[in-house]
């Protein structure tokens, strides 16, 4: 085990505070509509230009171990804000740095760190209650577009794309962001359920121009096992032929004789048929097949349920108005499932999302939920260069999470104003002792920093801007950094999702409280560089003069 260096008290906190300030100073320049870009060096490829606070924070690694510990703790604030709300990372970082800065002064003045932390926690509870009381539900498409535009640093086009996406797939639908191959940004919406499995054989293709299978008013057989022989299925296939309708087979695999027979029948025109592999693996596959069954009003054929293929009848098959299958994806539109059954399945998946502790499982469950409940919207972000596309994609990602958060918990005035108003509510907050009161005061001062920093980035005096906003008692009155005017921010569309602001405050105070109550720090001693042994002379080099 290598030797460690230990620092205590003021010495430890000072080094840690230096690291916090370095990270916060790099991140806070991106805040607000007039925030600047940060250029990140990459070990390969072109440098990355971004205004995304968490992307900047993740790049910072300091040489001094003690400074780096402080920086990494605040980086954690940005990461947690990004994970929980997808936005508000810069605000959370600015708040955390402000609380740590003020808290360190109070500890140095001899106050009890644990009482300070208790005061900070009391203040945060009051701030969260104030945000929830004053948040306004998002109802119109315009409000969603405004939230998206603000989060994308004032880009109205991105806001409009997001509002359209939410309108088309609903609040439960999945919105994914990809890089486009062209200059233009575009929105593509997939209605119905889509899963990432294509046709097993290209001989099933019905539209040769687009190389895809298109079937209208189709039956769907949902089978959990492999199909290698069609003997058990013959009665069912004959019944389907009698109806004159096409059949889509979803199974673990279709191979050998079964595949050959289906292809021959398809080519001869006796049976309109296509086969695709079932999506997912293991238990997830069973669940997804059950989803497809519920969506199409059919039954998943599984030996677990005691159903054998030879006993399957037409009324056990699913139905859909349209099925499209290309090389990579299968889309089922307008399944014949009962609305009540689909809603019950959606409620069941939502309950599983609440209970799961795995991020991966949660993501997969949300994908399943979206496929059942809404659909999938894909925003393809375009740009002139790769660097521009990546920077824009970062902003679209932020904006997408912000719009989701706004729909969940409503909106509050933007520009740091909601936090300024909440800070006024802390003035009369009752505490048990003076040190706790100082903890509340630390949060009260810190809450003005986001508004102050937005003004500074816009070239204004932060203190004057904060003073003018607080002089006006109207809740939504604030400073529009884009135009340099004071006005009602909500009516101008300058709004923040209440969830984003709440999570920024909670995460910032949580990590800052831990930093304030730190009394000792332990880090590895830097390794001393040792000179390696001299390189031996190569044979035949003796007597050479240079």
UniProtKB/Swiss-Prot annotation:
It is found in: Cytoplasm. Induction: By NifA. Keywords: ATP-binding, Chaperone, Cytoplasm, Isomerase, Nucleotide-binding. It comes from Bradyrhizobium diazoefficiens (strain JCM 10833 / BCRC 13528 / IAM 13628 / NBRC 14792 / USDA 110). Pfam families: Cpn60_TCP1 (PF00118). GO terms for molecular function: ATP binding; ATP-dependent protein folding chaperone; isomerase activity; unfolded protein binding. Its EC number is 5.6.1.7. The keyword Cytoplasm applies. Its main location: cytoplasm. One of its GO terms (biological process) is response to heat. Forms a cylinder of 14 subunits composed of two heptameric rings stacked back-to-back. Interacts with the co-chaperonin GroES. NCBIfam families: GroEL (TIGR02348), PRK00013.1 (NF000592), PRK12849.1 (NF009487), PRK12850.1 (NF009488), PRK12851.1 (NF009489), PRK14104.1 (NF010704). InterPro entries: Chaperonin_Cpn60_CS, Cpn60/GroEL, Cpn60/GroEL/TCP-1, GroEL-like_apical_dom_sf, GROEL-like_equatorial_sf, TCP-1-like_intermed_sf. Together with its co-chaperonin GroES, plays an essential role in assisting protein folding. The GroEL-GroES system forms a nano-cage that allows encapsulation of the non-native substrate proteins and provides a physical environment optimized to promote and accelerate protein folding. One of its GO terms (cellular component) is GroEL-GroES complex. It catalyses: ATP + H2O + a folded polypeptide = ADP + phosphate + an unfolded polypeptide. ATP binds at residues 30-33, 51, 87-91, 415, 496. This is Chaperonin GroEL 3. Belongs to the chaperonin (HSP60) family.
């Amino acid at each position: 085990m290598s030797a460690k260096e230990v620092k205590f008290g003021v010495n430890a906190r000072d080094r840690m505070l230096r690291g916090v300030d370095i990270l916060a100073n790099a991140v806070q320049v991106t805040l607000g509509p007039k925030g600047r870009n940060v250029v990140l060096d990459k070990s390969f490829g072109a440098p990355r230009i971004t205004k995304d606070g968490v992307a900047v924070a993740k790049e910072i690694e300091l040489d001094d171990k003690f400074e780096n510990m402080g920086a990494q703790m605040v980086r954690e604030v940005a990461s947690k804000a990004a994970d929980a709300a997808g936005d508000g990372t810069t605000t959370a970082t600015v708040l955390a740095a402000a609380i740590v800065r003020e808290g360190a002064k109070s500890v140095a003045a001899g106050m009890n760190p644990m009482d300070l932390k208790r005061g900070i926690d009391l203040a945060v509870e009051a701030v969260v209650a104030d945000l929830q009381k004053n948040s306004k539900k998002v109802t119109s498409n315009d409000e969603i577009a405004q939230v998206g535009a603000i989060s994308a640093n004032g880009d109205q086009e991105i806001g409009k794309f997001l509002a359209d996406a939410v309108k088309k797939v609903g609040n439960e639908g999945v919105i994914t962001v990809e890089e486009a191959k062209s200059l233009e940004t575009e929105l593509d919406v997939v209605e119905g359920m889509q899963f990432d499995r294509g046709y097993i054989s290209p001989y099933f293709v019905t539209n040769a121009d687009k190389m895809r299978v298109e079937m209208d008013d189709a039956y769907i057989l949902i089978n959990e096992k492999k199909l290698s022989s069609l003997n058990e299925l013959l009665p069912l296939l004959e019944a389907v032929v009698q109806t004159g309708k096409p059949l889509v087979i979803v199974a673990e695999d279709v191979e050998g004789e079964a595949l050959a027979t289906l292809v021959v029948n398809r080519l001869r025109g006796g049976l309109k048929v296509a086969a695709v592999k079932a999506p997912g693996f293991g238990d997830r596959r069973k669940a997804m097949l059950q989803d497809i069954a519920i969506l199409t009003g059919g039954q998943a054929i599984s030996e677990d349920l005691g159903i054998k293929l030879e006993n399957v009848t037409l009324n056990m098959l699913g139905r859909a108005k349209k099925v499209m299958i290309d090389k990579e994806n299968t889309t089922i539109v307008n399944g014949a499932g009962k609305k009540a059954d689909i809603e019950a399945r959606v409620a069941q998946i939502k309950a599983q999302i609440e209970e799961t502790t795995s991020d991966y499982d949660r993501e997969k469950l949300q994908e399943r939920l979206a496929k059942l409940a809404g659909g999938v919207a894909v925003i393809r972000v375009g740009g002139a260069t790769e660097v521009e596309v990546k920077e824009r994609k970062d902003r679209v990602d932020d904006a997408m999470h912000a719009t989701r958060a706004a729909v969940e918990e409503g909106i509050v005035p933007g520009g740091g104003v909601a936090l300024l108003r909440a800070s006024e509510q802390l003035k009369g907050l009752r505490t048990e002792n003076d040190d706790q009161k100082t903890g509340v005061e630390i949060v009260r001062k810190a809450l003005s920093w986001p508004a102050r920093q937005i003004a500074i980035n816009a070239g204004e005096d932060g203190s004057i801007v904060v003073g003018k906003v607080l002089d006006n008692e109207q809740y939504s009155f604030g400073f529009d950094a884009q135009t340099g005017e004071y006005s009602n921010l909500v009516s101008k569309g300058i709004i923040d999702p209440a969830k984003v602001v709440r999570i920024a405050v909670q995460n910032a105070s949580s990590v800052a409280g831990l930093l304030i109550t730190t009394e000792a720090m332990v880090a590895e001693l830097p390794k001393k560089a040792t000179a390696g042994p001299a390189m031996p002379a190569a044979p035949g080099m003796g007597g050479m003069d240079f």
